[in-house]
UniProtKB/Swiss-Prot annotation:
It comes from the Bacteria. Pfam families: YpsA (PF06908). InterPro entries: YspA (IPR010697). Belongs to the UPF0398 family. This is UPF0398 protein SZO_03970. SUPFAM superfamilies: MCP/YpsA-like.
Length: 171
């Protein structure tokens, strides 16, 4: 079994506030190419943390690919309360994560920063690599997870870059 953690920018961090934004189609096109490459290398699980934006789009692509490839998806939330304050539209999108093949949460609710560090450790040590849409020049709180990943000597990281998205848009 090979499991890849999929994470990246949230939609608001990219300035995307509608699924009709033309950038979403470009991002999904890149995701599809990359997920197919992973599947052809033998990956059979894609693991998500339940964030809207890149993860949501990757989950949608993975669900479409299930028609052709034998893959599984999982969501491991940091907290059981993840998304509890989101609006109705976002709650509906959150349901996609709750409908994956495997769903768990690490903690009932947030109590201290140590929980997030432990959660990151768990994700890294229970996956075989990560697929990220993240650029260190455009930092978000995802930087903590990326830094923890980079500390692992044999933890492969694959990044989707803004440059690559521009190339796909130009096709």
């Amino acid at each position: 079994m090979t499991a890849i953690l999929v994470t990246g920018y949230r939609s608001f961090e990219l300035g995307i506030f509608s699924e009709k934004d033309k950038r979403v189609a470009i991002i999904k096109k890149a995701i599809k190419r990359d997920l197919i490459a992973y599947l052809e290398e033998g990956v059979d699980w894609f693991i998500f943390t339940g964030n809207l934006g890149f993860e949501q789009w990757a989950l949608e692509v993975a669900n479409d690919l299930k028609k052709t490839y034998p893959l599984k998806t999982a969501t491991i939330f940091a907290f059981e309360t993840h998304g509890s304050t989101w609006n109705d539209r976002n709650q509906q999108q959150l349901q996609q994560f709750r409908a994956t093949d495997f769903v768990k949460y690490s903690y009932p609710s947030y109590e201290s920063p140590k929980q997030l560090k432990s959660y990151h450790h768990f994700l890294i040590h229970n996956t075989d690599g990560a697929y990220l849409f993240y650029d260190s020049e455009h930092e978000t709180r995802l930087s903590y997870l990326v830094a923890a990943m980079k500390e692992q000597p044999c933890y492969p990281l694959s990044f989707l870059s803004f440059e690559r998205l521009n190339d796909i848009a130009d096709e």
